[in-house]
Amino acid sequence: MAESGQFRFSFCPRDATPLVRTRIDGRDRPTCPVCGFAEFMFVQIGANTVVERDGGVLLVRLNYGPRDGRWALPGGLVENDETFEEAARRETTEETGFKVALDGLLATWMRPGFPILVVIYRAHITAGTLRVAPDEASEAAFFPKDKVPPLEELAWPSTAHGLDAWRAYEPPRP
């Protein structure tokens, strides 16, 4: 059960019996009183990149769904056959045309009750030219630290968190 009290299923996926709330492992979970099916809510994993060039960070302006017109870090969900790092590189290339190398984990973000964990990597461009994926973004641009869009123009809380981590990042001293 999500923290909001909503079940993902209303009926058992095995036998179509209406699900009931049952306390399992200290949480209310949707369960089938006939076959015993119990749903455990799992977290999705997203992988984003903070791509820096000439002191600016790369953001994409989304062009779909409720976040249409808002800015986000390049990234997306991790597929079940790839690592976090592979997903971060793949999503960045798909959304921006840039191939990137990852320079390390910058931050993670998760909010209880919101079923996603986002891992955010520092990255630099190794090849490619800027081009947006028209099915995902209307534009992409580099923003200097003092010109990053304000919070209300950002698509996700994880974007704001990643940008805060980028602003605060200090490279290790040799």
Tell what function each PLM region has.
Residues 12-15, 32-35:
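Short cysteine-rich clusters marking metal-coordination/redox-active sites
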Residues 2, 52-94:
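Conserved Nudix-box catalytic region and its N-terminal flanking loop in Nudix hydrolases
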Residues 7-11, 29:
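Residues immediately within or flanking Cys/His clusters that coordinate Zn2+
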Residues 34-58, 77:
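Conserved N-terminal beta-strand and adjoining loop/helix that marks the start
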Residues 78-101, 105-165, 169-174:
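Unchanged
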Residues 28-34, 104:
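Short Pro/Gly-enriched beta-strand edge/turn motifs at strand-loop
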Residues 51-52, 59, 123, 142:
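Conserved hydrophobic "DFG−1" position in protein kinase catalytic cores
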Residues 20-27, 41-45:
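Short Cys/His-rich "knuckle" micro-motifs
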